[in-house]
Amino acid sequence: MTVAYFDCPAGVAGDMCLGALLDLGVPLDYLQSQLAKLGIANEFELTTETVQRRGQRGLKAQVHLRDRHGHHHRHWPEIADQICAAHLPDRARDWSLKVFEALAIAEGAVHGIEPEKVHFHEVGAVDALVDIVGTCLGLDYLDVRQVYCSALPTGGGTVKAAHGQLPVPVPAVLELCQRYRVPLYSNGIEKELVTPTGAALVCALSAGFGAPPAMTLQRVGLGAGTQELPLPNLLRLWLGTVPAPPETGTAKTIVELQTQLDDMPPQALSYACEQLYAAGALEVFCQPITMKKSRLGVLVTVLCPPSAEAACVQTLFRETTTLGLRRQVQERYILERQMREIPTPFGTVRVKVAEHQGQRLNVQPEYEDCAALARQHQQPWQVVYQEALAVALKLWPLG
């Protein structure tokens, strides 16, 4: 299985990602032909140049805009429609949507508005579309199955933006790093090292941050940045292989705790279930049973990860009348799942997207989000749910 590791000693930006992928062998004409499907072929030219950064070779990717003043601001739903209509390779399309989605949510949080209302000043521009979609196309071309990233340098100072001078890291980058729990450090360089586009790419696509995973290294692509820095301004993209995961699916270990109760009022049992979820239980369910002396009771079953077992045991003893518990460790198979956010006419809805061996099998809007929006807009729950499901299936069709 092919994996990629973004090694970012000098930070990360969209053009650096593109340069590193082109340096790894992604054909320039392939990217240009695929990007033309976005309907922007007449608006840009993508070129490369071999450059030196502190004595080290790197490949500089440059997006030359043919009209710097003719691009209107775009919203996230417009960008999603543009990408979906382009008939890109499935994984490249999905990754591109995921990156723009992450950026829309971050920008919305910074400005205090819904993601679908964000004006993409820089991100909606053609150069950023090329950087983001081009990077996703390159990773797909190299058949990368898993992406990892190093800790990111914070940079420092200020940078000029559409709203004036901003401190570095800029707010959108900080929001992304906070949401995705990215490890940060300072290398003492007082410049912008991580751009919003670069942060969105590594945050949305990476399975983890920190040290590189164990891999057999095949080659390294070097993407050059624009600024002159005290260290080589290069993104180092490692390409390697790891053993493929089992074909039978994703296995997870869980602990099952059970107890039978016949002397608890239902109100107390309801509260106990709430406390079990708060303690880290994955699932809690109660089944009616007949106990000794023909007394009616309930069988309480708790499923939890091993890390939450002690807390769930303590909660059962504290909140129920049980004098003992049964325990067994089980293996379960689960689909690969991702929680995504989508814009709808009623507001943002979280959607659970489930896959198995690269095939998308299930897409489900979250009940609570639909219920909250139904109450807010005084609409039937089904109306909100069906609207969210239609948007989700358009972005992530099954199969």
Swiss-Prot record:
InterPro entries cross-referenced by the UniProt entry: Ni_insertion (IPR002822)
GO terms, molecular function: lyase activity; nickel cation binding
Keyword Secreted: no
Keywords from the UniProt entry: Nickel
UniProt xrefs under Pfam families: Ni_insertion (PF01969)
Family: Belongs to the LarC family.
Name by which UniProt lists this protein: Putative nickel insertion protein
Species annotation: Thermosynechococcus vestitus (strain NIES-2133 / IAM M-273 / BP-1)
Organism lineage string: Bacteria, Bacillati, Cyanobacteriota, Cyanophyceae, Acaryochloridales
